[in-house]
Amino acid sequence: MASQLTDAFARKFYYLRLSITDVCNFRCTYCLPDGYKPGGVTNNGFLTVDEIRRVTRAFASLGTEKVRLTGGEPSLRRDFTDIIAAVGENDAIRQIAVTTNGYRLARDAANWREAGLTGVNVSVDSLDARQFHAITGQDKFRQVMAGIDAAFDAGFEKVKVNTVLMRDVNHHQLDTFLAWIQPRPIQLRFIELMETGEGSDLFRKHHISGQVLRDELIKRGWIHQLRQRSDGPAQVFCHPDYAGEIGLIMPYEKDFCATCNRLRVSSVGKLHLCLFGDGGVSLRDLLQDDAQQYALEERISDALREKKQTHFLHQSNTGITQNLSYIGG
């Protein structure tokens, strides 16, 4: 079939976020504050390497150029390097990235790079080791920082760092973050805290609009960059005096969904049209044999007709997303 995925609102989809596990070994306050709780899925229930190969092949045939491997914590999969290589078999996929807590980055960055990984996002919500421990439940700050250094040593030209913006936690630490990226080619992405089914109280207490940071950046001479078609949702800013960049992800901003270019597949093979949508379309029965590819592509394309124009976060409707590890954040 090989036609570009397009929805009823003429949005084109070049970017797949593929969750390969919902297991995580961190207990971040905004995601899994009580730690990982199995939802009836064993490690054997997650997508296999062959299933991942087939689903990414179908998306590549439908115009996908970028695949981001998410979790949970993707690197907890023992076959993670094999998964990277399987995705990389598709020549049409130009970028293969991972979002990781950095737990195994120092050990494995070079192997991931060799397998075909082209991009790394690391979650770092504070540059203070004690606060990092308090947020994540893990005393691993120095290990994660060493992992970022290892990523550069392995040949990644830029590392993206995700920081969830939280009122009275880290929103006042802009100067500290800017000093950190001034000599380093790091794109630091501040992500507005999003409400989830399990996180409503935390959201009400700590949400702050990214507009506050955007106004401050513009006042300091930071310049808004143009997005590429397979980029994520961040508004990216650069400054001539800084090697690093700042990204702002503001899902509550008007028209945030107008430029949506990404779809999600969960670790058990469900297609999700929106992080905060309802339900999901099972693809797994069509991931068992290479001969099913045409039917798989048809199911993906047909499902896209149901994609809504926007999320409904403004009405506190978080859809199926009980926490951000559920379908890969």
From Swiss-Prot:
Cofactor binding mode and count: Binds 2 [4Fe-4S] clusters. Binds 1 [4Fe-4S] cluster coordinated with 3 cysteines and an exchangeable S-adenosyl-L-methionine and 1 [4Fe-4S] cluster coordinated with 3 cysteines and the GTP-derived substrate.
Quaternary structure annotation from Swiss-Prot or TrEMBL: Monomer and homodimer.
Protein name (Swiss-Prot/TrEMBL): GTP 3',8-cyclase
Function text: Catalyzes the cyclization of GTP to (8S)-3',8-cyclo-7,8-dihydroguanosine 5'-triphosphate.
Family label: Belongs to the radical SAM superfamily. MoaA family.
Domain of life: Bacteria
Biological process per Gene Ontology, one example term: Mo-molybdopterin cofactor biosynthetic process
Radical SAM core domain span: 8-234
Enzyme Commission number, as recorded: 4.1.99.22
Binding-site residues for [4Fe-4S] cluster 1, renumbered to this chain: 24, 28, 31
GO molecular function: 4 iron, 4 sulfur cluster binding; cyclic pyranopterin monophosphate synthase activity; GTP 3',8'-cyclase activity; GTP binding; metal ion binding; S-adenosyl-L-methionine binding
Residues noted as binding GTP in the record, renumbered to the chain: 17, 68, 99, 160, 262-264
UniProt: S-adenosyl-L-methionine binding residues: 30, 72, 123, 194
Pfam family of the protein (one): Mob_synth_C
Top enzyme class: lyase
Species of the source: Salmonella typhimurium (strain LT2 / SGSC1412 / ATCC 700720)
PANTHER family: GTP 3',8-CYCLASE, MOLYBDOPTERIN COFACTOR SYNTHESIS PROTEIN A
Keywords: 4Fe-4S, GTP-binding, Iron, Iron-sulfur, Lyase, Metal-binding, Molybdenum cofactor biosynthesis, Nucleotide-binding, S-adenosyl-L-methionine
Biochemical pathway: Cofactor biosynthesis; molybdopterin biosynthesis
Reactions it catalyzes: GTP + AH2 + S-adenosyl-L-methionine = (8S)-3',8-cyclo-7,8-dihydroguanosine 5'-triphosphate + 5'-deoxyadenosine + L-methionine + A + H(+)
Residues that bind [4Fe-4S] cluster 2: 257, 260, 274
Cofactor: [4Fe-4S] cluster
